[in-house]
Amino acid sequence: ADLILAFVGEEAILSGEAHCLANLNLQGAQSGLLHRLSETGKPLVTVVMAGRPLTIGREVNISDALLYAFHPGTMGGPALANLLFGKVVPSGKLPVTFPKETGQIPIYYNHTSTGRPASGSEKNIFTIPVGAEQTSLGNTSFYLDAGKDPLFPFGYGLSYTTFAYSNLQLSSTQYTRNEVIIITFDLTNTGRTDGTEIAQLYFRDLAASVTRPVKELAAFERIHLKAGETRHIRMELPV
């Protein structure tokens, strides 16, 4: 075989109301099977079918490519075949956040700010000396063994091509209530394959009268570009 195409995940009956799991790893012998397949030396393409984000960091590391199909329905077969054989270029973005470990849950991109926001410079369990005294590490909102970042954030998704953003501009730097902020930028397909990018506009209010999320999705636009094509994009953000 030129490559290995492995389908893993969960049955649909495991998803839905009152179908919670305490362990979000791949169930049964699936993870072990993938590791054995990766040891063959053949390129490993993993397709995950599940109704929830699973903790698949180890499987991502041993796979040459991974497609998260969720539960695609009765026409999922032809759709997956078109994606895997390159008839269609992937353009989907994650509608949820994928944790590194189950213990990171709840984890989501639009959480509100805390009194101890993570800075990214915190210590972790691997940098604490053996026999260290019991004292404060100065940590904030942080997991000693998993950090603050997810495995894959909300809005993440790859393609068979690549895109570059440039020349970001705002219509003004000062606004009043009920005005509209105009955001413009250039989007370029820098790869050799035609593809579709979903441009996402996020914002954060640093001086609100009430606590606001650290990041909020305000708008998105689906843009198809031929290989090498550049397009000037305009997005609007009501104040």
Predicted regions and their residues:
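Loop/turn elements at helix/coil->beta-strand transitions in domains of secreted/extracellular proteins
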Residues: 1-4, 40-45, 62-64, 90-92
